[in-house]
Amino acid sequence: MTSYPRPDFERNPLRWETLNGQWDFLFDDADTGLAENWQRTSLPEKVSVTTSNTREGASAESDSVVQKIVGDTQALIQNNVFSASSQTTNSKTKIKVPFVFQSPASGINDRGVHEVLWYERAISDLRTAQEKEQGHRLVLRFGAVDYEATIWLNGEYIGGHRGGHVPFEIDATDAVNAAGQSSAHRLTIRVYDSAYDLTQPRGKQYWGAKPESIFYTPSGGIWQSVWLEVVPSARIADSSSGTVIKSNDIHGGQLRSTIVTKGRRVGKSYNVELEASFAGVPVAKSDKKALPRETDTVAVDLNVRLSEEQRSKLPQSILQDAPLDNDTCWRDGVALWSPEHPQLYDLVIRLYDSSDKVIDEVKTTTGMRSIDWTKGDGLWRLNDKPYFQALCLDQGYWPDTFMTPPTPESLKTDIELAKKMGLNGCRKHQKVEDPLFYYWADKLGYLVWGEMANAYQFSQEYVERFNAEWTEAVKLVINHPSVVTWTPVNESWGYGSLKDNVDQRNHIRQLYYLTKSLDNTRSINDNCGWEHVITDLTTFHDYSDGPELEKTCASLDLITGQKAGRDMFVPAIPGVEEGAKHKPGAPVMNTEFGGVNIAPAKKEDGEENRDWGYTTATNPDDLVKRIDRLVRGTIEGGHCCAFVYTQLADIEQEVNGLYTFDREEKLDSTKVKALITDAIQTFYNRVNKA
């Protein structure tokens, strides 16, 4: 992983160094590292394990959580609990970052319970003498560390972060400067990641000894890229710090941005400039706008409509793929973004000092596209036109690396594999993916529903944790045109008492309005699948086989009826609140269905029950026929304007993917693409007749 991790927000000039690779690593199962000041003395070669943090047995509460999710018809593995470790010492070893210790790719491949982890390595100051003189900063950047990270440099605390699925950065400059002329600096990281805390957002990471049903091997510690970067002291901030580029005004052609800066010194004056080009043709450049005295934020608007002269300069390759008279590609000189024509504007943001010198420059992209779900006719629109979202459930796991993509290209490959099957997007399920995924979704034309890793028990601690991390997740990907819907919660996970618990309902309402306050341009799916509290979309999950699903999807009453024993909308609580109902005309979407595996061969070890799916096909041809009937049943019922097929690829024991775990075809992709394309056409035929 030697390519720059954030091509969606790249400085010019770019000065960085990857910290991926070999680190010293030590399990601290007795949690003695802080008391013994490992951050000051360096990691010991060995440490005694005087007490075990592995809890034998399982709580009835955690078992009931799992059983409620998977349903009473699915038997759980008996005694699926971690055994207490007999190990009396842990030795310092090497780990290959960014792969987690549970994975083979890390070089450790340990599936036991280790809740406290220590990482250490030497780093050097990348800054040149001139950069130091100019006051440039040395920043440590972490893609994601699950779950709580504390960071020291040369034994001095420099920062920390809580939240396992979102990036953070630490300014290491002062600690490096304090070390004087030293050329090597000791970077130490302590990570705490509970194996059992069900109020901690964890997504599909299981708390049992063996992954089962829809749950998988956990990923503890550093699981995305780590790198050093040299940045100007005063600089342009990314979306995580508040820079937002709104690109939904396809009629006015206005790009509306809020540019945030960091590192502004008191009394200093700065100006911000935004420039746009398309396919190498300069389109527009804003006036230089002064940062107000009272804030580090400035609004910059830009008209990105191409004039006739600018359009005449476009390369023929662009015009052949996206003719100017095609209103799905262009709107009165505005280049439109869609899965079929993912046209992107190149943007450059510049920061000037008071002497009109460029002190920072960042390159990024955007796509002009609008989303509408409010017409009241049951349709979801992209760029003013009804659009059918044919999505897959994409959970982002790989055989030897788990939640970490094995290579940067793996993220691009998954998008290409989905499109090969005739799909135009995904629900990125129970995971905030590496930002490189969204970069490729923008470039390749792939719709994405933004989601977060849920927890499984409700508490005030959970509310505080989730609000903070969900906010960071939304801000991380808010500038990507490929992201079209927000889904904070899935299937009431963590909200087991919505039927009569006002506190749980109020938190889902809070998440809805919190998300709206961050971004009112995208649809919000409050609680995907059932028990909606307040939502823009009526989404339901139904893993019935073909005939039963056809019956359900032909009736709005059956669609909005109970699913998996849950009400589709929360009922009234007498004397307390009215509950919720389907809003007539709101888009209806089947956001989980399918999940069909192929009947496994008998195994001598008796583990055939580990090959798991919701329903079972006899062979690949039977699987294609089942998918055809499920897809047609969803669409031809006349109510659904989107589906999410479960799932893109097999994961461990859940072998109901369109591809195997290592991304090999399980069935003929040309047949699947043809049947999906044909079924979607029936949707457009019906809409066009209306």
Language model regions located:
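Accessory carbohydrate-binding/adhesion or oligomerization-edge regions at the termini
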Residues: 1-106, 190, 196-199, 204, ...
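Accessory beta-strand-rich segments of carbohydrate-active enzymes
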Residues: 9-10, 15, 26-30, 61, ...
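Structured, non-catalytic alpha/beta "coupling" segments that mediate domain-domain communication
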Residues: 21, 25, 218-225, 229, ...
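Short, solvent-exposed loop/turn and secondary-structure capping segments
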Residues: 35-37, 151-154, 162-163, 198-202, ...
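Active-site-adjacent substrate/metal-binding segments within catalytic domains
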Residues: 82, 93-126, 133-142, 146-154, ...
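Extended acidic/polar, glycine-enriched regions
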Residues: 177-186, 260-375
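Contiguous beta-strand segments within globular domains
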Residues: 245-261
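Substrate-binding/catalytic cleft of secreted carbohydrate-active enzymes
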Residues: 425-664, 671-676, 684-688
